[in-house]
Amino acid sequence: MGSAVLLRDDFDGAALRQLARQTKDANQARRLLALAAIYDGGPRSDAARIGSVTLQIVRDWVLRFNARGPDGLVNGKAPGGRAKLNAAQRQALAKVVESGPIPAIHGVVRWRRKDLVQWIFQEFRISMDETTVGRELKALGFAKLSARPRHYAQNELEVDAFKKTSPPLWRKSEAGSRKARTSNSGGPTKRA
């Protein structure tokens, strides 16, 4: 069995408790208090009990604390996947979207995401999903534009004949025209 990983020398239990009081991150405070118990000479099993974790996790906290100090005990955000397009490829994509497709060359009259997926593969040999292309376009400042939907059998010449020409006529109701009936209990009742 290996020996325990030692904590760094530039902190002590009191300093870690002070940092735990000042932090606004509850997880960091719990980890600092667990490490303070180790600094005070307590066994690592007590630190695991204080942190409500296993000994392996306490060891991971010690390694993170030794490497980056108290900031190493804050949960970091996962970096996520690497972008498929580099800056030059993004600029080429923006340029081709702004200039629009050439029907004789690209075979389309307007860019759709699936057409851009095909263009990116032909130009850069990078396979992308349509949603990823949409995310890239949004990051470049482009927005999806769509025409107002129309019925396929709509006759544009007869649209004016069906438009409402007069404004609605509003009249005031007579006073007391809708007097609600009440029951013996005071609530409204239905008409028979």
Swiss-Prot record:
* InterPro entries xrefs: Homeodomain-like_sf (IPR009057), Winged_HTH_dom (IPR025959)
Signal peptide coordinates: none
Region: Disordered, residue numbers:
168-192
* Keywords assigned by UniProt, alphabetized: Plasmid, Transposable element
For bias kind Polar residues, which ranges apply? 182-192
Answer whether the UniProt record assigns the keyword Metal-binding to this protein: no
In the UniProt record, does the keyword Chloroplast occur?
no
> In this record, what's one Pfam family?
HTH_29
**Domain of life of the source:** Bacteria
As for family, the record states: To A.xylinum IS1268 ORFA.
Q: What is this protein called?
A: Uncharacterized protein y4pG/y4sC
Species for this entry: Sinorhizobium fredii (strain NBRC 101917 / NGR234)
